[in-house]
């Protein structure tokens, strides 16, 4: 677009830059087109500067490249008539550059960030739904996808590149979004993908084992999450006081809102707070009574399990802290919809209840099983596996949890990737006291089918790990498969 100009874009950092109109900002030279700005970053796997000739051949208007080797910060060169501006620490600056390029979209809507191991998707979706019920135009960004509510487009990563994030936010603002709830991953924080965003509020859900193949240990993982509050424009902090890490952080964040289901709040010690005073679980969800700095209330929820009550309370506390009226939030709470693939319930007359959930960490699996147990009067089945080419340490932990909390654990495949499926299953079984108690069924579709066909009417069958995903990765192939579709089809056929 003509209103994007290279000189204006770089004004805070570099002087004497030529005035060039810019169309789009791209990190991938393969999609660069005439009039684009190509940004050549040095990544973990590739050096974008190697692709500068390709970008020039494709007609880009200008290039910004990492200042390394013989180039200095702020240096301007020209290659085949194309200006190349070198900036040091380009990855760290990318969010700010993209923010300027897309006219600071986080200033144009109310943006809430949600970080934590589990609960990010449900909390963001509930928050956006709730804000929309109160008159906002809600949008979400995260694992399930990006977009206005009801018009979400699938994504590859929880948090896209720094350019993607600003581009998507700009698009949402352009579509009329006034409120956006965004999942913020630990990878995204460490890699500076959201460093220039202006969050109105930042929510911490919990911290448990995940991504240790990337972070190395829990200390580094916690430090990555803490970056949202220590180095970002986090706005109002909303912290889960039931989490041990959350309680540590509350001690460092005196203005944070503390949220609890387990009475981990002393109103004399914290600033503002919200806590559940009573939760009644029933067949169709839960009745939640709460007290808070803003007053008391009762909400009927269609969500399953204690952790979803926690997610709902975090969403409620965030909206209260952003000055949405308590009475309107209470009056609309019953209209909140369960989230796709997150403790999503499938039923048919006379058949077992099937619950599809994304739980793929030890903590999430334990919580999903505990949640399902609250609504189960018969046997609790758990069909699950672990991803290949990922953190192997969690496999025996998940095996132990399934054995402890399910009546009938069924171990199967879940994106084995390049690993041998049976080897992954054996790693899971190694965590069980009595591996012979578990049913082993290689091939996820067969495992799910067998469980649903064999379960009785008052049983609950938890299908854990895939949630909203509609694929299975075997070797290098991405095959069509969905727990949700399989469950719906089987119950429909059985009914």
Swiss-Prot record:
Location relative to the cell: Cytoplasm
Catalysed conversion reaction: UDP-N-acetyl-alpha-D-muramoyl-L-alanyl-D-glutamate + meso-2,6-diaminopimelate + ATP = UDP-N-acetyl-alpha-D-muramoyl-L-alanyl-gamma-D-glutamyl-meso-2,6-diaminopimelate + ADP + phosphate + H(+)
GO biological process: cell division; cell wall organization; peptidoglycan biosynthetic process; regulation of cell shape
InterPro entries found in the cross-reference section: Mur-like_cat_sf, Mur_ligase_C, Mur_ligase_C_dom_sf, Mur_ligase_cen, Mur_ligase_N, MurE/MurF_N, UDP-N-AcMur-Glu-dNH2Pim_ligase
Record-listed N6-carboxylysine modification sites: 225
Residues annotated to bind meso-2,6-diaminopimelate: 390, 414-417, 465, 469
UniProt-listed Pfam families: Mur_ligase, Mur_ligase_C, Mur_ligase_M
Post-translational modifications reported in the UniProt record: Carboxylation is probably crucial for Mg(2+) binding and, consequently, for the gamma-phosphate positioning of ATP.
KW Transport (keyword) present: no
Chain location of the short sequence motif Meso-diaminopimelate recognition motif per the record: 414-417
Binding site for ATP: 116-122
Entry keyword Cytoplasm: yes
GO molecular function ontology, one term from the record: magnesium ion binding
One cellular component (GO) term of this entry: cytoplasm
Keywords: ATP-binding, Cell cycle, Cell division, Cell shape, Cell wall biogenesis/degradation, Cytoplasm, Ligase, Magnesium, Nucleotide-binding, Peptidoglycan synthesis
Highest taxon of the lineage: Bacteria
Recorded metabolic or biological pathway in which this protein acts: Cell wall biogenesis; peptidoglycan biosynthesis
HAMAP family registered for this protein in UniProt: MurE
Functional note: Catalyzes the addition of meso-diaminopimelic acid to the nucleotide precursor UDP-N-acetylmuramoyl-L-alanyl-D-glutamate (UMAG) in the biosynthesis of bacterial cell-wall peptidoglycan.
Name of the protein in question: UDP-N-acetylmuramoyl-L-alanyl-D-glutamate--2,6-diaminopimelate ligase
Native source species: Enterobacter sp. (strain 638)
